[in-house]
């Protein structure tokens, strides 16, 4: 029973400290768009992994550098002959008969050797190429991190706006539902008093049912899009998160002002990656050619050896005999059956492929910037058109509503005005979304972080 209680208390303690650790994490309750971007760039899991990859590349750089620095190693060797080897020596050396052999055992049963070895690379062409390659590898890792940051930033902005746009749509749908409920109540009274037809009442109920279905769908989408935003931010999906900004505060003049005077591809991240790919292939070509160069290294070894009949190597009176050695090693490649030549030619072809790919990427990005700029300009124009159409459709619907209940227009005309308003509301939402997507897409191509 006591053991069970101890286990129970231990489990409760673990749960308590786990809950305390979770509560101690600093998660904001509400974020603006800028705060969401900042939080996401620090906590997004893809960015964290890309950052760790840069750190790995940095360590790889120092690992390569260390190859050309002094390498020191120590060793210790203990041997205990259970039976010493026997050698045969002509017996005449000891005064015996010619043609006979004497059995002799040399040395002591136990031997211990301890030493230190220093190795130093003096010249290796491939090592020098490797040093250059580590810098390129580090640059490539940094490019991947930069591309990841750009893509995550774009996704965060799009997701943040998606939540706001879904909420704006919910606002439209709720307003439409309430208006339809009010109209339906008034229409039922007219029908009961014989001033309208039953078909008009049924038509209003169908419209109301459709709007309520769309509203339920939009409310579910609000939760889903908010969870997607949390996932991008590295934020717990189970924790509440409020968005401080709204569409009014974000649809400022800056949203509709991105000017591309002369499209440049130099700062585009895909161009940077292609440039580093070319550098990498060029270094690989140099590396294959460097395999024909000689390699020169030096070493220095020093050791002490002790011999004994029994294990006395830890005693002070044990005798140790020293030895040291210095040497230089030269390796000169002579003939590889044309393998080095084939590898060099293959690497040279890869360089030409990388050059062609770089040129292709530059031209493609240049065209994409022009197309994206044109699409953004069109999206801005469509937004202002959609905004005007929404205001116009609202006025038309309100006028037709008054005329309908005054008996000046029929249910068909009123129905058309309602559908025109719903369509204008939908187009307005899509227009804002298009402006945001086109703008952030253009900024990503230009590698610009302007808001």
Feature annotation, model-predicted:
Residues 1-39, 88-98, 219-260, 443-451:
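Terminal intrinsically disordered/low-complexity segments used for targeting and assembly
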Residues 24-73, 77, 83, 237, ...:
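Bacterial Sec-pathway N-terminal export signals of envelope proteins
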Residues 25-28, 75-116, 246-254, 299-332:
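Small/polar, glycine/serine/threonine/aspartate-rich low-complexity segments that form flexible
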Residues 48-52, 65, 122-149, 199, ...:
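Sec/SRP-type N-terminal targeting helices
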Residues 59, 148-265, 375, 379, ...:
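Periplasmic alpha-helical coiled-coil/stalk elements that build and connect Gram-negative outer-membrane
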Residues 62, 117, 284-287, 329:
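Outer-membrane beta-barrel architecture
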Residues 66, 213-235, 388-448:
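Short segments within alpha-helical structural elements
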């Amino acid at each position: 029973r006591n053991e069970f209680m101890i286990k129970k208390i231990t489990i409760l303690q673990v749960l308590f400290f786990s809950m305390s650790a979770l509560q101690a994490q600093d998660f904001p309750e509400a974020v603006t768009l800028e705060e969401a971007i900042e939080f996401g760039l620090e906590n997004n899991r893809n960015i964290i992994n890309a950052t760790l990859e840069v750190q790995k590349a940095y360590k790889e750089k120092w690992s390569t550098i260390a190859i050309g620095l002094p390498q020191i190693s120590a060793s210790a060797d203990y041997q205990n002959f259970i039976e010493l080897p026997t050698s045969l020596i002509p017996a005449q050396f000891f005064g015996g008969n010619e043609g006979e052999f004497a059995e002799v055992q040399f040395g002591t049963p136990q031997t211990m050797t301890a030493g230190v070895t220093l190795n130093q690379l003096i010249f290796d062409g491939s090592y020098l190429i490797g040093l250059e390659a580590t810098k390129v590898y580090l640059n490539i890792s940094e490019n991947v991190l930069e591309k990841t940051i750009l893509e995550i930033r774009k996704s965060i902005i799009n997701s943040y706006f998606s939540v706001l746009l879904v909420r704006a749509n919910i606002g439209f749908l709720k307003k439409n539902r309430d208006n339809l409920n009010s109209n339906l109540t008034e229409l039922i009274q007219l029908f009961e008093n014989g001033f309208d037809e039953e078909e008009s009442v049924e038509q209003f109920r169908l419209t109301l049912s459709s709007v309520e279905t769309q509203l339920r769908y939009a409310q579910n989408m609000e939760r889903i899009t908010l969870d997607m935003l949390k996932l991008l931010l590295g934020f717990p999906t189970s924790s509440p998160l409020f968005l401080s900004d709204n569409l009014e505060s974000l649809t400022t003049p800056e949203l509709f002002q991105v000017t591309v005077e002369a499209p440049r591809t130099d700062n585009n991240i895909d161009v940077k990656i292609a440039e580093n790919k070319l550098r990498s292939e060029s270094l690989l070509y140099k590396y294959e050619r460097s395999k024909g160069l000689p390699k020169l290294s030096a070493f220095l070894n020093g050791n002490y050896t002790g011999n004994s009949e029994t294990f006395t190597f830890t005693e002070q009176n044990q005798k140790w005999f020293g030895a040291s050695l210095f040497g230089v090693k030269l390796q000169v490649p002579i003939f590889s059956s044309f393998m080095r030549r084939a590898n060099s030619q293959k690497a040279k072809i890869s360089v030409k492929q990388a050059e062609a790919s770089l040129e292709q990427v530059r031209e493609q990005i240049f065209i994409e910037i022009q197309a994206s700029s044109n699409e953004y300009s069109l999206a801005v124009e469509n937004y202002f058109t959609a905004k005007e159409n929404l205001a116009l459709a609202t006025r038309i619907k309100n006028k037709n509503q008054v005329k309908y209940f005054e008996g000046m227009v029929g249910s068909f005309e009123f129905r058309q005005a309602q559908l025109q308003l719903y369509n204008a509301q939908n187009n307005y939402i899509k227009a804002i979304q298009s402006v945001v997507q086109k703008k952030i897409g253009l900024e990503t191509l230009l590698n610009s972080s302007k808001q």
